From Swiss-Prot:
<feature type="transmembrane region" description="Helical">
    <location>
        <begin position="226"/>
        <end position="246"/>
    </location>
</feature>
<keyword id="KW-1133">Transmembrane helix</keyword>
<dbReference type="InterPro" id="IPR005797">
    <property type="entry name" value="Cyt_b/b6_N"/>
</dbReference>
<keyword id="KW-0496">Mitochondrion</keyword>
<dbReference type="GO" id="GO:0046872">
    <property type="term" value="F:metal ion binding"/>
</dbReference>
<dbReference type="GO" id="GO:0045275">
    <property type="term" value="C:respiratory chain complex III"/>
</dbReference>
<feature type="binding site" description="axial binding residue">
    <location>
        <position position="83"/>
    </location>
    <ligand>
        <name>heme b b562</name>
    </ligand>
</feature>
<comment type="similarity">
    <text>Belongs to the cytochrome b family.</text>
</comment>
<dbReference type="GO" id="GO:0008121">
    <property type="term" value="F:ubiquinol-cytochrome-c reductase activity"/>
</dbReference>
<feature type="transmembrane region" description="Helical">
    <location>
        <begin position="288"/>
        <end position="308"/>
    </location>
</feature>
<dbReference type="InterPro" id="IPR027387">
    <property type="entry name" value="Cytb/b6-like_sf"/>
</dbReference>
<keyword id="KW-0830">Ubiquinone</keyword>
<dbReference type="InterPro" id="IPR030689">
    <property type="entry name" value="Cytochrome_b"/>
</dbReference>
<comment type="function">
    <text>Component of the ubiquinol-cytochrome c reductase complex (complex III or cytochrome b-c1 complex) that is part of the mitochondrial respiratory chain. The b-c1 complex mediates electron transfer from ubiquinol to cytochrome c. Contributes to the generation of a proton gradient across the mitochondrial membrane that is then used for ATP synthesis.</text>
</comment>
<dbReference type="InterPro" id="IPR016174">
    <property type="entry name" value="Di-haem_cyt_TM"/>
</dbReference>
<keyword id="KW-0812">Transmembrane</keyword>
<keyword id="KW-0679">Respiratory chain</keyword>
């Protein structure tokens, strides 16, 4: 008799994705982040669902309802902080996952990569609208500043902003629709993640060497299920350390002040995971130029397969490209730091130089270095 997991229509899908899936025998811990992102998403949907049971999306009561969750709801405080810090863990895993893709040349799986870039945009949109919901000072002013960027679009900009706001400023209508967006987007992310996996399983996983691994495959279960469980336990450990010992470490103190349209905070800045893009936006002293640079900083990922000039897929055996990659990582950390600093000397010039370097490394230095490496190997 054939095993039910191989015949049952539903279990067959699960079996082919998580049990009998042929996986390369040498994938490292950098390949753990896909499953960790799945766990983060499930965790965010569950904690978010319980928060939504007590949250009210009205300007008069939103801030109070979040306070009520923390003070009066059974274990509301832990649910709220798991959700807030879960977003940070989500982005840490995302950045690691994308970084892995860049380092090991996983972007040559075009469909998987492009869906991944769409996923990145969707997660960023979800995090942005979610940050507005507690209706603190930074929520309100963050929403005002970021939505206002759309007014840089010629001709239709102003109308577009007012249409998104549902009025002439960020107000009750804006908060209500942002809550609706924040509720629906995670389910869209889950659907996109399934498509992402579908395309990945068409080709099979990449591996650190970048060499096809068809000759050396092992079953996903038990080898990588146990490895993923270890990753998940570590993820939960780090998340709970953050939640229980330093829940406000990554937040902004201004968001504990209720939103006040008449009082602007001294430094308007987004959550830490958007600071690198915010620094690129601020480094251009022109509104439309800044918006284009902001979008380009993420959209540039779509160009990665076109910019790949090396005859090797992975960076594992390319020391010069490795150097450039880690300079790019350092540059992104610099941009993250600058994004949280006030707009004054010397931060302005550092931000501008770091922004130029970011685009210069990706668009010029990496393709040129890859070509030089090809020539050094007489390829």
């Amino acid at each position: 008799m054939t095993n039910i997991r191989k015949t049952h229509p539903l279990m067959k899908i699960v079996n082919n994705a998580f049990i009998d899936l042929p996986a390369p025998s040498n994938i490292s811990s950098w390949w753990n982040f896909g499953s960790l992102l799945g766990v983060c998403l499930i965790l965010q949907i569950l904690t978010g669902l319980f928060l939504a049971m007590h949250y009210t999306s009205d300007t008069m009561t939103a801030f109070s309802s979040v306070t009520h969750i923390c003070r009066d709801v059974n274990y509301g405080w832990i649910i709220r902080y798991m959700h807030a810090n879960g977003a940070s863990m989500f982005f840490i895993c995302l950045f690691m996952h994308v970084g892995r893709g860049l380092y090991y040349g996983s972007y040559t799986f075009l469909e998987t990569w492009n869906i991944g870039v769409i996923l990145l945009f969707t997660v960023m949109a979800t995090a942005f609208v979610g940050y507005v919901l507690p209706w603190g000072q930074m929520s309100f002013w963050g929403a005002t500043v970021i939505t206002n960027l759309l007014s840089a679009i010629p001709y239709i900009g102003t109308n577009l902003v007012e249409w998104i706001w549902g009025g002439f400023s960020v107000d009750k209508a804006t908060l209500t629709r942002f809550f609706a967006f924040h509720f629906i987007l995670p389910f869209i992310i889950a659907a996109l993640a399934m498509v992402h996996l579908l395309f990945l399983h068409e080709t099979g996983s990449n591996n650190p060497t970048g060499i096809p691994s068809d000759a050396d495959k092992i079953p996903f279960h038990p080898y990588y299920t146990i490895k993923d469980i270890l990753g998940i336990l570590l993820l939960i450990l780090f998340l709970m350390l953050l939640v229980l010992f330093a829940p406000d470490l990554l937040g902004d103190p201004d968001n504990y002040t209720p939103a006040n349209p008449l009082n602007t905070p001294p430094h308007i800045k987004p959550e830490w995971y958007f600071l690198f893009a915010y620094a690129i936006l601020r480094s251009i002293p022109n509104k439309l130029g800044g918006v284009l640079a902001l979008i380009s900083s993420i959209l540039i990922l779509i160009l990665m397969p076109l910019l790949h000039t090396s005859k090797q897929r992975s960076m594992m055996f390319r020391p010069f490209s490795q150097c450039l990659f880690w300079i790019l990582v350092a540059d992104l950390l610099t941009l993250t730091w600058i994004g949280g600093q006030p707009v004054e000397y010397p931060f302005i010039i550092i931000g501008q130089l770091a922004s130029i370097l970011y685009f210069f490394i990706i668009l010029v230095l990496m393709p040129v270095t890859s070509t030089i490496e090809n020539n050094l190997l007489k390829w």
